[in-house]
Amino acid sequence: PPAETFMMILAIKIVSETNAVGSTGVDITGMETAYAAVNADYGGDMITAAAENRYGRTYRYTAGLTEPADITGGYLLARSDTAKAKQDAANGFVTARGCAMNVQSPAWCGRDAMAYISEYYQAFEDAVYAQDAAGNYTGYNAETGKYYYEYCDLTSLVQVYLLQRLAADACAVGVSLSFYKDAGGLLYAGPVSDMELACGDIGADDDFDGGRYLVSALLQIPGFRAAVGNYCHDTFLVQAQRLVGDGGRVMT
């Protein structure tokens, strides 16, 4: 999405529809429709159960569902409350670093599909946090042979980071973290939402980047830092400056 779209939320508390899959929301493959096509009672009297993926991480799925032909998308994920390493939607998973992700769509997700998306996301997280023997962050998952940007679109990661960094939102990434993935495609960061504390509730002297999930590791990857700098210089900075008034305050 263009930078202008992200900028619109900087100066206001957003009142809008909840993130959802659809032509006016996240326009990706509707897996709920695909599930309903092969499960006559989809959405009624669903029962969930727990299992472990190949990384040994727990996920919750909907029992008894017939899977659609393509389980690679679309998914809409949102981070759960960081105070508890447990998803609070019907289906979701917990990563190796204690990040609980809700699967917002499809609302009811079969076992194979949940294994797929939880393992895909874990491979991405492992790539972000990967280090070489000297402790340098590489962004490379040696087990899968892929870089983090081969799992998640790099530009979307940069956009979400810059927006939340500029907004100085305490919820950024900690709670306000969403991803979506279409069938056969990469994961994308966003849409940005749940910024009810924005803007500026983190003071100038506070450390926004240090210790924050994903961000603290991404910023130690040289390629990500370069991508942030390039996008900020070429696109983001001009849009941000339009919002800044006298004294450096974001205009309302």
Model regions and ranges:
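Phosphate/dinucleotide-binding and metal-coordinating scaffold of catalytic cores
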Residues: 1-252
